[in-house]
Regions:
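Soluble catalytic regions of membrane-associated enzymes that act on cell-envelope
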Residues: 1-197, 203-207
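Short beta-strand-plus-loop segments that form exposed binding edges in beta-rich domains
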Residues: 214
């Protein structure tokens, strides 16, 4: 699939959206961002945690990424097991028996120049979208995400529902502060906290106005 799609792993990264095991990107010799290792540093852990990636002290992985982090970290290719439907603006450029392959045309190469105002950026905060907004302000002088509070409905003990309205072409994310939910279902697709950041959810983007049920 890599060869047939002409994947460039010299200038760009490739990530697996829904891995089955830790370090699966390494297993497939992908130049990804996920890692499970006792050599992980505190500085790296702080970075991926604040940016929204799924993480613990000795690991981090792609889950929790956004279009912004894909762009900034040069993630041009996404492999998604075809047991899951990916609602994305990225173009599907290949498929195999197990994976669909998507390409992100806005991914930046390994090195690029930014305003020196980024040196004043403080990597702090608990809301990944606000952290990314501040980082973008330091890089380009602009904020990207429009923030709003959404209400939830308690269905039964320990369970809440959200209904989030997205306009056509709008990419939605939902941040749930506090204790990470063990299981989340987004429009019928279930994800466990072991391999996903269930505090920070990618709601996808759609061709028509859509209500996403979480």
């Amino acid at each position: 699939l890599l060869e047939s799609a002409g994947v460039d792993q010299v200038d760009y990264r490739a990530a697996i959206v829904n891995p089955l095991v830790r370090n699966e990107e390494m297993l497939y010799q992908l130049n990804g961002i996920s890692m499970y290792s006792s050599t992980n540093t505190e500085e790296m852990w702080d970075f991926v945690k604040n940016m929204g990636f799924e993480n613990l002290e000795n690991r981090f992985q792609y889950a929790g990424s956004t279009e912004v982090t894909d762009m900034l970290l040069g993630i041009r290719y996404l492999f998604c097991r075809n047991t899951r439907k990916l609602h994305t603006v990225y173009k599907k450029i290949g498929e195999s028996q197990s994976f669909d392959l998507y390409e992100n045309p806005r991914a930046l190469k390994a090195g690029y120049m930014v305003s020196d105002s980024v040196l004043d950026y403080a990597m702090e905060g608990t809301d990944p979208l606000e952290v990314q907004n501040r980082l973008l302000s330091g890089i380009a002088g602009k904020r990207l995400y429009k923030m709003q509070t959404v209400s939830s409905e308690a269905v039964w003990a320990g369970t809440v529902d959200f209904d989030i309205s997205l306009k056509k072409g709008e990419h939605g994310y939902l941040y749930i502060p506090g204790t990470e939910p063990e299981t989340v279902t987004i429009n019928g697709q279930e994800q466990k906290s072991d391999y996903w950041n269930n505090n920070f959810l990618d709601l996808g983007t759609y061709d028509t106005d859509t209500v996403v049920h979480v």
